[in-house]
C-alpha cells in the first residue's frame, strides 16, 4: 500500500490511502487488417508538436475510393470553439456534407488563438488537400486539434509533417494495415494511456460492410455535441476527438442524421469530470468502397435503420473506452435511469448523477451512499409535455435505487418505493470493490423513458494529473 495522504480538516488529521489505477493494457490489442474498411490510407507521425521526440502527434487520414465520400460531424457546443471546429464546420456546410480527408494534431488545441489560429487551421487543410488523389470541392479535408488551450501551433513543423506524406516523399508512411491504423490512433493521444482503436463488420441486404474508428480522451470529458452545419446557441460544459470510417455508401443527409442519433447515445452519454472541451469533435466518413448502393433514410429506410443501429453500437463501444481511460479512474460505472417521462428526462438525470462530485467520490471510496444518488436525481427539473401543462413531478414514493454487479450475481436494492432497505454493507462493499458495476434508478413508471450514461470515479490521481498538466 502506498504512503498515506494526510488530510487536515479543522483539528483532525485523517490518513487516506490512495489506490492504484487499474491497468488498461488489456484494452489495447491488435486487430486483423482485414477488419478495416476498404478505400482508406492513414498514418501517424511525430511532427514536433509534442516535446518528447518520437511520440506521434500528427495523424493523416485519406479516402482513396473512386466513389464520392460523404462526411458528417458533431461538434462541441462550447462558446469558445477552437479554430479547427469552426473551419471544419464551414467546409462541411459549403460542400454539402462531402470530405475525403482528416488531419489531426495532438499537443496543442489551437483554441482561443485568434486570427493566427484560424490561419493555421486552414494551412493544415490546404496541405492535406494536396495529398488527395482527386477533389471535387475547393477544400475536402476536416481538421482536429487537441492539447493545451491558448497556445499557437508550431505550424511550420506540422506543414512539414503533412508534406512528408506526399507520394513523392521517401518518408511517406500512409498505409491501410493495422500498423497504420495504430499509428494514427496513437497520434490522437494526450493524457490517454492507450490508443483507442476498434473495428466492426456488419451486413445489410447481403452486402458486407466495415466500420473502424479511433478516439481519444481521458480528461475534460463531458461532451455535448451537435450536428455540423448549424449555428449553436446552446452553451453547456483533455478533449474528446473521434473519427469513424466506413466503406458503406451513405447519403450526406442520412449520414449526419445517423451520427447525430448515435452521438447522443454514446459520446454525449459519457463523463469523466463534467468539463466540456472547446474542441470536442466526432467525424464520420462513408466512402462507398464496399458497394455503390446508397443507404438513405427516405429511399432505403430499412437499410438506413440498420446502419444507424450499427453506428450507434460502434460509437458506444468507442465512447466507453474514453471512460475506462478516465484520468486516475479506478471504476467504470454504468448509470441507468428508467421509468422517466421521456428519453430526454432520463438522459438528464443520468447525466446529473454521473457528473456529481459527491457521487464520484463515493464511487472511489466504494461507499454505497445512495442518498447522493437520490439527491442528484431530485435536482433535475423534468420537461413539460407541452407548453400548456406544468412539468411532471417525481413521485418519491415509487422511486427505487439498485446497485447491480457486473459479474451476474444478485443485484442489491438500497431504496424500494421510496423506503430505505436494510442494506447489507458487506455485500455493498463487495460489489463496489469491483471495477465495473451499475447504478440503476427506477422512477416508478412515469413513462417509457430510459437512458444510460457511463462514468468513472474521482481519485487523488486525477488531481495530480491535472495539477501537473502544463508542466
Curated annotation (Swiss-Prot):
The record marks 146-147 as: Involved in the stabilization of negative charge on the oxyanion by the formation of the oxyanion hole. It is an enzyme of class 2 (transferase). The keyword rRNA-binding does not apply. Keywords: Acyltransferase, Amino-acid biosynthesis, Arginine biosynthesis, Autocatalytic cleavage, Mitochondrion, Multifunctional enzyme, Transferase. Pathway: Amino-acid biosynthesis; L-arginine biosynthesis; L-ornithine and N-acetyl-L-glutamate from L-glutamate and N(2)-acetyl-L-ornithine (cyclic): step 1/1; Amino-acid biosynthesis; L-arginine biosynthesis; N(2)-acetyl-L-ornithine from L-glutamate: step 1/4. It is found in: Mitochondrion matrix. GO terms for molecular function: glutamate N-acetyltransferase activity; L-glutamate N-acetyltransferase activity. Its main location: mitochondrion. The alpha and beta chains are autoproteolytically processed from a single precursor protein within the mitochondrion. It comes from the Eukaryota. Its EC number is 2.3.1.35, 2.3.1.1. GO terms for biological process: L-arginine biosynthetic process; ornithine biosynthetic process. Pfam families: ArgJ. It catalyses: N(2)-acetyl-L-ornithine + L-glutamate = N-acetyl-L-glutamate + L-ornithine; L-glutamate + acetyl-CoA = N-acetyl-L-glutamate + CoA + H(+). SUPFAM superfamilies: DmpA/ArgJ-like (SSF56266). The record marks 238-239 as: Cleavage. One of its GO terms (cellular component) is mitochondrial matrix. Heterodimer of an alpha and a beta chain. HAMAP family: ArgJ. Belongs to the ArgJ family. NCBIfam families: ArgJ (TIGR00120), PRK05388.1 (NF003802). Catalyzes two activities which are involved in the cyclic version of arginine biosynthesis: the synthesis of acetylglutamate from glutamate and acetyl-CoA, and of ornithine by transacetylation between acetylornithine and glutamate. This is Arginine biosynthesis bifunctional protein ArgJ, mitochondrial.
Amino acid at each position: 500500500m502506498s504512503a498515506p495522504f494526510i488530510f487536515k480538516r479543522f483539528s483532525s488529521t485523517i490518513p487516506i490511502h490512495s489506490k492504484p489505477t487499474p491497468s488498461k493494457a488489456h484494452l489495447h490489442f491488435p486487430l486483423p487488417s482485414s477488419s478495416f474498411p476498404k478505400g482508406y490510407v492513414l498514418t501517424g507521425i511525430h511532427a514536433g508538436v509534442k516535446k518528447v521526440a518520437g511520440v506521434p502527434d500528427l495523424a493523416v487520414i485519406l479516402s482513396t475510393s473512386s466513389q464520392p465520400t460523404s462526411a458528417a460531424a458533431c461538434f462541441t457546443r462550447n462558446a469558445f470553439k477552437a479554430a479547427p471546429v469552426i473551419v471544419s464546420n464551414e467546409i462541411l456546410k459549403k460542400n454539402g456534407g462531402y470530405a475525403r480527408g482528416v488531419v489531426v494534431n495532438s499537443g496543442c488545441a489551437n483554441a482561443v488563438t485568434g486570427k493566427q489560429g484560424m490561419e493555421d487551421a486552414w494551412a493544415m487543410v490546404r496541405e492535406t488537400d494536396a495529398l488527395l488523389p482527386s477533389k471535387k470541392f475547393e477544400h475536402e479535408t476536416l481538421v482536429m486539434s487537441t492539447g493545451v488551450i491558448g497556445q499557437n501551433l508550431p505550424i511550420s513543423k506540422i506543414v512539414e509533417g503533412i508534406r512528408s506524406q506526399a507520394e513523392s516523399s521517401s518518408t511517406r508512411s500512409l498505409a491501410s494495415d493495422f500498423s497504420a491504423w495504430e499509428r494514427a490512433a496513437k497520434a490522437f493521444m494526450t493524457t490517454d494511456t492507450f490508443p483507442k482503436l476498434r473495428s466492426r463488420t456488419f451486413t445489410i441486404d447481403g452486402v458486407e460492410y466495415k466500420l473502424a474508428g479511433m478516439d481519444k480522451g481521458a480528461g475534460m470529458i463531458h461532451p455535448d455535441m451537435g450536428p455540423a452545419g448549424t449555428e449553436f446557441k446552446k452553451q453547456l460544459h483533455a478533449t474528446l476527438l473521434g473519427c469513424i470510417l466506413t466503406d458503406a455508401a451513405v447519403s450526406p443527409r442520412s449520414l449526419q442524421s445517423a451520427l447525430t442519433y448515435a452521438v447522443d447515445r454514446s459520446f454525449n452519454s459519457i463523463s469523466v469530470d463534467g468539463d466540456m472541451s472547446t474542441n470536442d469533435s466526432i467525424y464520420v466518413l462513408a466512402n462507398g468502397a464496399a458497394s455503390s448502393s446508397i443507404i438513405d433514410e427516405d429511399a432505403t429506410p430499412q437499410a438506413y435503420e440498420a446502419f444507424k443501429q450499427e453506428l450507434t453500437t460502434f460509437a458506444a463501444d468507442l465512447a466507453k473506452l474514453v471512460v475506462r481511460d478516465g484520468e486516475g479512474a479506478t471504476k467504470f460505472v454504468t448509470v441507468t435511469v428508467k421509468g422517466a417521462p421521456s428519453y430526454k428526462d432520463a438522459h438528464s438525470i443520468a447525466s446529473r448523477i454521473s457528473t456529481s462530485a459527491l457521487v464520484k467520490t463515493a464511487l472511489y471510496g466504494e461507499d454505497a451512499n445512495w442518498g447522493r444518488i437520490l439527491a442528484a436525481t431530485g435536482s433535475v427539473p423534468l420537461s413539460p409535455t407541452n407548453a400548456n401543462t406544468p412539468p411532471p413531478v417525481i413521485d418519491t414514493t415509487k422511486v427505487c435505487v439498485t446497485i447491480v454487479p457486473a459479474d451476474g450475481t444478485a443485484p442489491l436494492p438500497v431504496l424500494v418505493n421510496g423506503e430505505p432497505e436494510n442494506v447489507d454493507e458487506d455485500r455493498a462493499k463487495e460489489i463496489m470493490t469491483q471495477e465495473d458495476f451499475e447504478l440503476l434508478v427506477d422512477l416508478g413508471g412515469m413513462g417509457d423513458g430510459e437512458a444510460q450514461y457511463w462514468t468513472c470515479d474521482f481519485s487523488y490521481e486525477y488531481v495530480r494529473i491535472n495539477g501537473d498538466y502544463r508542466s
